[in-house]
Amino acid sequence: METVTIVFRVMMYILVLLVLYYLYKFLYGDSWAQKDIVVYSASSHTNGMPSNNSNVTTLTTSVPQIYPGGEYSISTWMYVNSWTTAKNKPFFTLSGGGGSFKSLVLFLGQRTNKLGVRISTTSGSKLNAAEMGKITSSSPMAPYTDNDISMCDIESVDLQKWVNVTVVLMGKTVDVYMDGKLARSCVYGTTFDADGNTPTITLGGPDSFSGYIGLTRAANFAYSPDIVYSHYQQGPFAGFSLSSLNPFSYDLTLSSNGSTIFSTSNE
């Protein structure tokens, strides 16, 4: 009889745990789970997303939830054809979907070759509509002019090649990686901010640079350096190999019994 009682109690404990688990799933879904999602994928250089489309590309499906002061990572690829000098060129934004402000904005400078990396903080400045207007104005206003170099900005971006940009948000800390390597690590006075519960990413648009945007992903956790480099190795589109970053620096040679039967080399 005592054995039956023990078994019954164990079964009841398991049942209670299952009920609590499914209740939590019902209330909160799987937002607690780590997600690393490809939100935009380009299959080749020729059909990568033209960055300066007439309309902004808005992505909401499968974008992981973002919380103020938590952890979040984004990785995107860009191919800059040329540096136009009309104005700043925002090409990536991340927001919580509330509509009040952007959590993260990436833009290229007006006349100076630089990558602007700006965030909203909980008790500091917000990237609201007025601030976004300062960025995209034909006469950019402080703190978004070419002379305004934020602690997270990158002062040089390679042209006419695919470049990977990864930004990792961790509370007050922002890490910026270029082509898989840490380029900037900066600490703000307060944590990054986010509003709403429909996380949204926008890519390109009429104010963006002349070129292409490749594979873009987002994660609700902080990428480690190994993950950043692994994503860089995967490249900007499906079927990618590292040689495609600079295809003219590689030769293809086919040989049979020691004799060359085909070669792309000019030698």
Map each language-model feature to its residues.
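Extracellular glycan-associated modules
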Residues: M1-E267
